[in-house]
């Protein structure tokens, strides 16, 4: 399993939301680039960036910053949030971003998703953001009738290699991840699963590692200092 430290971006600043609520925004560091570099210095193998402006409105105002990070660090960077056209996918991947995470567009435009996978294969991941078993889109602002298990199976059938699963009700809470939800998903699909939302401490990292997931994304726990990133990385590498 790999650990992906997360940086959520609003107006070029590193922030955290509580349960995806844009009104519960907290700036967690001074500078996005320096935060990303510090994660690399601590031994991170991959960095997870979320463009919250993009997720909410589809804007690309943070893309220049993301590309700078992708090109100046020595580790791969993935980006999610507001990526809703093939042109944007191409622009980001052609300019150094290692993987893009599609959310809303994966729900709304199957043909675009298939085209992106045909060309970029594993550089395309799909974010499955859910609450009470239902998938959400538009920066977690829009509920759908899609069941998260059925949606994950559909993504696997389309050819998606990697899904990032977030329990919105856990995000930013430090209450621990939704382990049962992740176990159920792991039993159902054979593609790579990255868990996001709720991680608090090293015990949570051990729990997720025991499920044999591809990755675990953690943000707030690092900023709140309830989790040592170096220790989490060390545990994630055991037995690799």
Curated annotation (Swiss-Prot):
GO cellular component: cytoplasm
Pfam families, A to Z: His_biosynth
GO MF annotation terms: 1-(5-phosphoribosyl)-5-[(5-phosphoribosylamino)methylideneamino]imidazole-4-carboxamide isomerase activity
Pathway, per record: Amino-acid biosynthesis; L-histidine biosynthesis; L-histidine from 5-phospho-alpha-D-ribose 1-diphosphate: step 4/9
Coarse class of the protein's main subcellular location: cytoplasm
Record keywords: Amino-acid biosynthesis, Cytoplasm, Histidine biosynthesis, Isomerase
GO biological process, alphabetically ordered: L-histidine biosynthetic process; L-tryptophan biosynthetic process
NCBIfam families for this protein: 1-(5-phosphoribosyl)-5-[(5-phosphoribosylamino)methylideneamino]imidazole-4-carboxamide isomerase
Subcellular location, record wording: Cytoplasm
Active site: 8, 129
Catalytic activity field: 1-(5-phospho-beta-D-ribosyl)-5-[(5-phospho-beta-D-ribosylamino)methylideneamino]imidazole-4-carboxamide = 5-[(5-phospho-1-deoxy-D-ribulos-1-ylimino)methylamino]-1-(5-phospho-beta-D-ribosyl)imidazole-4-carboxamide
Record's keyword annotation contains Repressor: no
Superkingdom per UniProt: Bacteria
Annotated source species: Clostridium beijerinckii (strain ATCC 51743 / NCIMB 8052) (Clostridium acetobutylicum)
CDD domains reported for this sequence: HisA
Protein name: 1-(5-phosphoribosyl)-5-[(5-phosphoribosylamino)methylideneamino] imidazole-4-carboxamide isomerase
């Amino acid at each position: 399993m790999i650990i992906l430290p997360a940086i959520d971006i609003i107006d070029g600043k590193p922030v955290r939301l509580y349960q995806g609520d844009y009104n519960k925004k907290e700036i967690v560091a001074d500078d996005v680039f320096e935060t990303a570099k510090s994660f690399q210095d601590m031994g991170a193998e991959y960095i997870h960036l979320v463009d919250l402006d993009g997720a909410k409105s589809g804007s690309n105002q943070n893309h220049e910053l993301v590309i700078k990070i992708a090109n100046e660090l020595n580790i791969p960077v993935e980006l999610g949030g507001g990526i809703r056209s093939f042109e944007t996918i191409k622009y980001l991947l052609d300019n150094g971003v290692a993987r893009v995470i599609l959310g809303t567009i994966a729900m709304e435009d199957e043909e675009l998703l298939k085209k992106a996978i045909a060309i970029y294969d594993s550089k395309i991941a799909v974010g499955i953001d859910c609450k009470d078993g239902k998938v959400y889109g538009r920066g977690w602002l829009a509920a759908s009738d899609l069941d998260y298990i059925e949606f994950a199976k559909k993504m696997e059938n389309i050819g998606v290699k990697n899904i990032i699963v977030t329990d919105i009700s856990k995000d930013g809470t430090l209450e621990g991840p939704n382990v049962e939800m992740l176990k159920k998903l792991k039993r159902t699909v054979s593609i790579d699963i990255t868990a996001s939302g709720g991680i608090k401490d090293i015990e949570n990292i051990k729990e997720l590692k025991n499920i044999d997931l591809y990755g675990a994304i953690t943000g707030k726990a690092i900023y709140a200092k309830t989790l040592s990133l170096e220790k989490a990385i060390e545990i994630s590498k055991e037995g690799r």
